[in-house]
């Protein structure tokens, strides 16, 4: 939690290696602005991670139901509900669950669609799963999402100004 400049000094130049990732500068609407409530938010098995711009209006109702089903929450945010909802339809490998296999594999995009049918509110989301590496699912409802296309890369943001230093080629998700 804190300013981007603070993160840069915290990692001390030790930038993680990888081919995909998500992050979010959060405007706190649910839960205090602290490291526990900082994005991305994981599911119970640290498989699915979600960043979210918006407000989930029915998060309390959804969270109560998920708690009764045995989900464990670590934050006070509405966002964490999303990772647990998606987990119901895209469980981590070896954990069982109610996912509908497609071609013998769980399908992250279909899990997101199923989960979001239960959600009321405005959102711009970026979702990744360790069990489906290299893929970022971006989805929106009444909140902006822009995708920047660069040299061998795609960048998802809620505002074009966040990515214009990387690319001038942007597509607004409808």
Question: Predicted regions: what is each one?
Answer:
Residues 1-174:
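Conserved short alpha-helical segments that host acidic/polar catalytic motifs at enzyme active sites
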